[in-house]
Amino acid sequence: MKTPREENVKEIDVMASRFVSYLIPFTNPDDFEEQYARVKKLSPKADHYPYAYIVGDIQKSGDDGEPGGAAGRNYLHMMEEKGIGRALIVTARYFGGTKLGLPRLRRTFLEAAALAIDTGKYFEITMRKLFKVELSYREYEILKHYAPKDGIRFEKTLFGEKVEATLSGNDTIPSFLKKLAILGECSPLGEAETLEEI
């Protein structure tokens, strides 16, 4: 799954109506009212503000007075298809005087949201296994050289009589250490979520 790194705002105009879409990093559904009000301040006097958000298993959408099915549910489907979560999309629509009809209105809302989504910058959310290892300084130097090639990262390192390191990667870290003849103690610490720029 990917999540926005920063807010992205895009605008399209169709038959004198303006559609301003906001893609917003969003991690807490309790913050919805605050974010929604902020968008309304950024785009005052818009006629409607349909929205959708996904945070984990929580999904919510609304059309804010637009004809049913014009935007919100379609935003959710698009976000799911594109693998986007922890995100809020809100489109401020300024009516230009010409009715678009429901099919064109739906397409235009989707086009505006897709533009904000497709041009956004993202983090990839991944779960990594954590392991605590105790190393000699020689083992540390060997591991520091080979670990990145196997996708293993040093998350925390303490230097003392020996080196204590917290490594993140996949389940193969213990066997990788054995392959390198690193025989220090290796203890699993669980999992951690990481964000990587994409």
Can you describe what each PLM-predicted range is?
Residues 1-70, 156, 181-198:
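C-terminal regulatory domains involved in ligand/effector binding and gene-expression control
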Residues 22, 50-51, 86-89, 132:
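Structural motif
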Residues 28-30, 136-139, 168-175:
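Helix N-cap motif at beta-to-alpha junctions
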Residues 74-118:
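Active-site beta-strand/loop microenvironment that shapes enzyme catalytic pockets
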Residues 106-118, 132-134, 183-198:
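Terminal alpha-helical anchor/extension segments at protein ends
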Residues 122-137:
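Short glycine-/aliphatic-rich beta-strand segments at the starts of folded cytosolic domains
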Residues 153-171:
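Non-DNA-binding regulatory cores of transcription-related proteins
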